[in-house]
């Protein structure tokens, strides 16, 4: 039996950066380390971190458990409000936000300050999007067709960005629909899907063409590997 493994399989650069730096922080043993939520969507890696003493802070816990601790901001990033809350307890904040997510945060912050409405195409409950939305005053998330009906019927200028792990076809579809809704409005479109995501999406299509079946090995909580709604 022939097994065809994709050349882009494995951790992307953002995940590698977060994982390597978390292990590096743990090796210093300067203080107890907590990750604000799950560092990445990979249970094996999370188990390895737990085995060396790195703890995961969950939202249902009292934030006082972070007092005097080192707190790691996971690859998905967080909102400014969340960072402020963590900083009021932690001794040290280590920001391991993926550089592509940080780019979106910067765009949203910039254009929001210039008076633009921000339209984010992505999953509203995904940690990345929750964090990104925290950088805007006037922000809407489009994930399903019915979300388009929630957009205001006005002519306010807008910025459109995408979740880094979004399917390109979904981005193109919603951009076209938003443009159709706001024909006389200034709209700035930024395709912020990361290169690694597009590479994997394109590669799996090519692999499917030359094989009888395709298996995707992934964590069940990684919503971007599921079919788009």
What are these regions (language model features)?
Residues 1-229:
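The feature marks the mature, well-folded catalytic cores of soluble enzymes
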